[in-house]
């Protein structure tokens, strides 16, 4: 957890100014005890900004440019996913139509088979009747 800490005493402030050689600073610095990084919050004059010491900075923050690049790449990735899903949806729709056509064709074939079976049954019945008549004729 970050905590705001003022310079503890004047000596600490002067040590900071000595490190920068020139400049003044008025404000707070924020210490992150997890990774010992320091962030400044306050007013710096121009010389202090130019000569400030190298201090490890918390890397959790990103610049606007980095964020926009990430957002753009993420948007592009989402667009690719959307187009892929749209193409797959179209394929599924086409396959559904093909399945419906096959079902209609299957129904027509089953009706044709029923008609063929009925015709064969009628022919079988006729043959049976003819056999009975032939038997009667032969028996006379």
Swiss-Prot record:
Q: Which SUPFAM superfamilies match?
A: MPN010-like
The record's Pfam families line, in alphabetical order, gives:
DUF16
Task: Please give the family membership noted in the entry.
Answer: Belongs to the UPF0134 family.
Q: What is this protein called?
A: UPF0134 protein MPN_130
């Amino acid at each position: 957890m970050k905590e705001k800490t003022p310079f503890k005493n004047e000596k600490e402030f002067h040590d900071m100014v000595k490190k920068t050689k020139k400049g003044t600073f008025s404000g707070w610095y924020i210490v992150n005890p997890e990774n010992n990084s320091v962030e400044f919050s306050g007013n710096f004059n121009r010389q202090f900004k130019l000569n400030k010491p190298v201090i490890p900075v918390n890397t959790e923050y990103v610049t606007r440019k980095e964020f926009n690049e990430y957002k753009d790449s993420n948007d592009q990735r989402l667009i690719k996913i959307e187009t892929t899903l749209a193409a797959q949806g179209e394929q599924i729709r086409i396959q559904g139509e093909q399945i419906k056509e096959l079902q209609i064709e299957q129904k027509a074939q089953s009706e044709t088979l029923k008609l063929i079976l009925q015709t064969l049954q009628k022919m079988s019945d006729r043959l049976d009747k003819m056999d009975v008549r032939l038997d009667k004729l032969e028996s006379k």
